[in-house]
Each structure stands twice: as C-alpha cells, then as structure tokens.
A protein has these predicted regions:
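Conserved glycine-rich beta-strand-loop-beta hairpin in the small C-terminal domain of fold type I
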Residues: 122, 139-149, 159-166
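A generic "structured core" feature
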Residues: 37-40, 44, 63, 148-152
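Short, conserved active-site loop motifs that form the nucleotide-linked donor/cofactor pocket
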Residues: 42, 72, 160
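Residue-level signal for well-ordered alpha-helical positions
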Residues: 23-24, 56, 66, 102-105
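Active-site phosphate-binding strand-loop segment of PLP-dependent enzymes
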Residues: 1-55
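Conserved core segment of the aminotransferase class I/II
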Residues: 68-139
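Short amphipathic alpha-helical segments and helix-helix/interface helices
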Residues: 30-34, 60-64, 99, 149
Length: 166
C-alpha cells in the first residue's frame, strides 16, 4: 500500500497486546515495519496502554526506541498501570511541531486533564516505586487471566479459538 499510494498520512498501531486480539508483534515484524516507515517517511502513532503488563516472555522494544528519524509518536497511559478510569497519559516525541499541534488539539478537546487526577498521580509517583506497583498488579492480573483461560478451555466448544495473553 505504501509503495502504490501517496494518501497514507499517518499509521496508528498497537504493537503490544493489541485489543481485542491480544496479539503482540515479534521483534522481526517491528524491525521490518520500521524499515518501511523509514523508507517512506510515514509518521506513526504507537499506542502502548498495555506494554508494561507483560506476564510472560521477554519485553520487546517499543517502535519509538527503534525510531531513528523521529517518525514515531509514543502514547502511554496511567489507567492500565495505576488506576482504571484515570484519564492521564503521556505523549513522547522530540518533534516540536507535532507536540505543538497535539497541545492545540488537547486544549480544544478538554483544556487539561483533571487537576485532582494529576495531583493524585503525582503524589503516588513521589511516594511509591512505580515498577514495584506494576509487579504487584501483574501478579493479580495473571491470576485473573489464568482463571479466565481455564474457564474458557472448560466451557467453550473446541471450535472456538482464542489467544493466550502474554
């Protein structure tokens, strides 16, 4: 598609634990994707809400960490690793033009994230080790995942296929 059209202005991807499939891109796929992105110089939004919640297997590099041309805009959120429903996230880019446009759009949408949510998050980050917290919630989530998989295996007909979330 990239070779045959000039209409592609941006690509949005979730390479880690894509919802609803739970699929994760392999390292090889990430590398090939970045080769294409660099060749055609297409901006990419990498949405990574679940990246910190890997239960098994090895962590894979983000596309942003593989980005040599500043084409990847990385999005993260506190709602999956700190508090569900919390509407605080972050944007990582060194492209000032992109960040300026994002700021403009954000202000047009809601001016700012809740001040109370920001203060709660700030206090939590000052008082706690975020990595240790993530490990605690992963222990809870992996038990829930295992219970869900067990129930699905016991209940669903064999024709039903599903992924084993990592």
């Amino acid at each position: 598609i990239l070779a045959t059209t000039e209409n592609v202005k941006m690509i949005y991807v979730i390479p880690d634990f894509q919802n609803p499939t739970g699929k994760t891109w392999t390292l090889e796929r990430r590398q090939k994707f970045m080769e294409l992105i660099n060749k055609y110089e297409i901006p990419v939004i990498e949405d990574n809400p679940y990246g910190e919640l890997r239960f098994e297997g090895e962590f894979l590099p983000s596309l942003k960490s593989m980005d040599t041309k500043d084409l990847v805009i990385f999005l993260g959120t506190m709602s999956k690793i700190f508090a569900p429903g919390l509407r605080i996230g972050w944007v990582c880019s060194t492209n000032a033009e992109v960040l300026g446009k994002y700021n403009f759009i954000k202000q047009g949408a809601d001016l700012q994230s809740s001040t109370i949510d920001q203060l709660i998050t700030n206090q939590f980050l000052e008082d706690n080790d975020l990595d240790a917290h993530v490990e605690k919630i992963k222990a809870v989530y992996v038990k829930r995942r295992d219970a869900m998989l067990k129930t699905m295996e016991e209940t669903f007909p064999k024709e039903v296929k599903f992924t084993h979330p990592e």
